[in-house]
Amino acid sequence: MTLVEVKDDKLEIKPVRLRKEKYKAQLENKIFNEDELYLFHEGRNYNAYNFMGAHFTSENRKRGVRFTLWAPRAKNIFLVGDFSNWETKEENKLNRINETGLWSIFIPRLKEGIKYKYYIEQEDGKAVLKADPYGIYSEVRPNTASILCEKTKIRWSDKKWLNKREATNYFESPINIYELHLGSWKRKDEDEFLSYDELSVVLPKYVKEMGYTHVEFMPLNEHPLDASWGYQVTGYYSVTSRYGDIKGLKRLINALHKNDIGVILDWVPGHFCKDEQGLYMFDGTPTYEYEEKWKADNKGWGTFNFDLGKPEVKSFLISNAFYFINEFHIDGLRVDAVSNMLYLNYGRNHGEWIPNIYGGNENLEAIQFIKELNEAIKTYSKGVITIAEESTSWPNVTNDTEYGGLGFDFKWNMGWMNDTLEYNELDPIYRKYHHNKLTFPMMYNHSEKFILPISHDEVVHGKKSLIDKMQGDYWNKFSNLRAYMAYMYGHPGKKLMFMGCEFGQFIEWREYEELEWKLIDKFDMHRKTHNFFKDLNNFYKNNSELWELDYDGDGFQWIDADNNEQSIYIFIRKSKNIEKYKIFVCNFTPMVYYDFNIGVPEKGVYREIFNTDKKEYGGSGQVIKGNLFSRKGWCHNQPYTLTIKVPPMAVSVFERIIEENKTEEKIVKEDKYI
């Protein structure tokens, strides 16, 4: 139950304050801490997993398991499992421990590995079997029981990483995320997944060699359907058993940290799966979902939306975030489908939704939940980042909550992604008519702290793979991909790339089979593309101009944004060191331009330091090997001019160099571009 109050013209949703005294006589011989329960029912217990669910413990000198469940409108609840032949027995009946819906029981002599569920009798006389909402391990699908599991500790060896994480300013650091689906990255054979432990041997090495800074795992919470990719969750605290056990996942994360790779987890706090064993109508009535059917039912995805105003649901979800932060050492959460949470009319037609108390379409409870989530993580887990997948123009997503923002650290730039993909799908002949597709994103670039995403959503459902989206014949597709990627890495904002794009897989991603790694060995262009991505990733990571001032207006400057006739874009990326900058020349047509003049800000010697048209990458080899000397003369509103060669469908990057004990004239005499 909640109260809505208006204070200082701001809406505040506050839980009804529950008097602590209410619990004191009902705490089963003081097994439960009254403050924990109080905070749980206030929506402010962020470690509820420490007492909810199943916990091995000793009571009255007996070793066993304490089970605790929230089911406020259940009539009776029994624990059933293979220990009881799945029969309800009076000695396994849970006790109601307070009038707000908590139930609990201690059962001695239970062992790890026992399968169990809750048999919940509803007020209407019907009964249903439910998995434990706080259960930390489950049967492999299609089976659905929870499995008793001791708190699984491993010997962590990532202290150095965690200390570094806490001290890092991620806004001024390189972030280059490799998004992957563990079940289809690599497999043993057609039908067998690699386990967490097997992945810990190969994945960290691969990601480090490729030059990525982070991985982002698609959801690893337990889910019944492989084809949902993990986004329709039944067990929020249960790490999916498809790939092994809890310790295995911890060892995988530990191995990634030891290789200086951060771990971001895709997380779905907005809606949940309708399967009977899950949270849906948990006690026979709307429990985790909204009471109002229109508000609960997510018709677009066939799921139910969480009631983000219920205190116990808030405790459940925010505790779930901290469960993975504290127990698994994850470094960030990518929050899925934030738009679905923010808008009452998201995915609904006119007449299918009811406005909020102010007449608007904003979900006020969800806004408050998101703010509390981000505030809690910033307060208690310094260095852990949160990322919003938010597809609308909702303002201040990455602004601090104290200034009216939602409090996320980063937001996916879906507008940039849509515009740039549309541009690169065009025949180069027509690109001059759509020149603003690549310039417009800079108009709003500093409104949020953006991540530029090329995610799994862009390479499925008939959208084509990334390489196949590119226009032209075989050669041009690869050259266009390289140019697009170099432009992306030069554009302000952190980076995210989905697995398989890094070697140009032509088929769309399919969750039921591994990536086509064989292409790298069989075909030169795929091997060269793979090497290109490795070089591009490391070029990005090793040059602070490409990330240090991502969110500072001084970090980017157009030299020429208006050359639509030739589809050429020229810009500068800068660092805090005013002497360091990189000049990007991006050509999105298959034309070569010789003796091409560009404006540069300073007199000096320049050198081409990266070129996507290198033969080693599969290009035509139109590169500049020597040094270049700028001459005085205005060009592109810059005081000096540099004459270069512009390679076809490619990006070339230049920097100004200074060599000790050599004059610029001497350098020029020694080197010329070819």
Swiss-Prot record:
Q: What role is this protein assigned?
A: Catalyzes the formation of the alpha-1,6-glucosidic linkages in glycogen by scission of a 1,4-alpha-linked oligosaccharide from growing alpha-1,4-glucan chains and the subsequent attachment of the oligosaccharide to the alpha-1,6 position.
* Listed pathway(s): Glycan biosynthesis; glycogen biosynthesis
Active-site residues from the entry:
D336 (nucleophile), E389 (proton donor)
In which organism is this protein found?
A: Clostridium perfringens (strain SM101 / Type A)
Identify the keywords attached in UniProt to this record, alphabetized.
Carbohydrate metabolism, Glycogen biosynthesis, Glycogen metabolism, Glycosyltransferase, Transferase
Catalytic activity annotated for this protein? Answer: Transfers a segment of a (1->4)-alpha-D-glucan chain to a primary hydroxy group in a similar glucan chain
Gene Ontology CC: cytosol
The UniProt record lists the EC number as 2.4.1.18
Subunit description: Monomer.
- Name a Pfam family for this protein: Alpha-amylase
One GO biological process term is: glycogen biosynthetic process
What CDD domains does the database record attribute to this sequence? AmyAc_Glg_BE, E_set_GBE_prok_N
Q: Which InterPro entries match?
A: A-amylase/branching_C (IPR006048), Branching_enzy (IPR037439), GlgB (IPR006407), GlgB_N_E_set_prok (IPR044143), Glyco_hydro_13_cat_dom (IPR006047), Glyco_hydro_13_N (IPR004193), Glyco_hydro_b (IPR013780), Glycoside_hydrolase_SF (IPR017853)
As recorded in Swiss-Prot or TrEMBL, the protein's gene is named glgB1
Tell me what this protein is called.
1,4-alpha-glucan branching enzyme GlgB 1
UniProt cross-references to NCBIfam families, sorted A to Z: branching_enzym, PRK05402.1, PRK12313.1
| Similarity annotation | Belongs to the glycosyl hydrolase 13 family. GlgB subfamily.
GO MF annotations for this entry?
1,4-alpha-glucan branching enzyme activity; cation binding; hydrolase activity, hydrolyzing O-glycosyl compounds
Instruction: Reply yes or no: does the keyword Transferase apply.
Output: yes
